[in-house]
């Protein structure tokens, strides 16, 4: 059989004679191999993802911060990539988590292979991954993102099923976009979220993206307040029969004027309602308000049927 390494803990004392010279020693040897194995397993659980074997968020953030500290001393730039798979939720919802886990494991292996030896990479969320690496002078920070997209965009085959997942990737640069891993990952996440909403791809962070996110968050809070306090309005656009010139109906349109007196375009607040989970509440309010208006018109003798 092949030799096996074992860990031992040695404790002992030295007995000295009258001249203070050692004359004998005695002690114990304790086999601690099992204890070391347990410690190693606990370390793996604490710092590595059990499904993919990649460093977890805690470990990845720590390693990336060490890279930033080294880059700061050397005066070099670091790129931080935030990777999110585009259609992974559909796989879990349609085929279950066993299939989803196998697909994710394959994608994680590709992700690891596409990263260079000295890169820091980790799984930071359900289907979210990060990669940090030092930029060479003149290197395009989006080039690595494109390489990752190519590797992750190839079909994954599992149990005779073929899945095309793909990835959206946001990129932030040290020191231009932040001085800590937390800030860089947040900014890369913002860039990823923006490009994902536009159909996927890769995007370098800029300050305008941060302002755009702040406005979206602010609008979400204001919209929730407006719905709770019935501050939206229904405007009705008439439909006229061209041959007779008579009114044949109206189209109900949701409109919102915020507390500062600014009209918010439906093209802006409806996507926010979808993101914040308010779209059903908005629909309920629209139908309720339209029903009230129909009743009012009927009581006034008008026979107008709105299209909501």
Predicted segments with their positions:
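Per-ARNT-Sim (PAS) sensory domains and their PAS-associated C-terminal
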Residues: 1-12, 21-23, 246
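Sensory-domain boundary capping and coupling elements
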Residues: 10-12, 27-29, 166
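Catalytic strand-loop-helix junctions within cyclic-nucleotide turnover domains
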Residues: 17, 132-141, 159-162, 167-184, ...
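Sensory-module boundary signal marking interfaces of small helical input modules
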Residues: 18, 32-35, 88, 202
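PAS-family sensory domains
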Residues: 21-31
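Conserved long alpha-helical elements within nucleotide-processing catalytic cores of c-di-GMP signaling
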Residues: 36, 43-47, 53-79, 86-116, ...
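Cyclic nucleotide signaling catalytic output domains
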Residues: 121, 147, 151, 157, ...
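Active-site core of bacterial EAL-family cyclic-dinucleotide phosphodiesterase domains
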Residues: 215-272, 296-304, 308
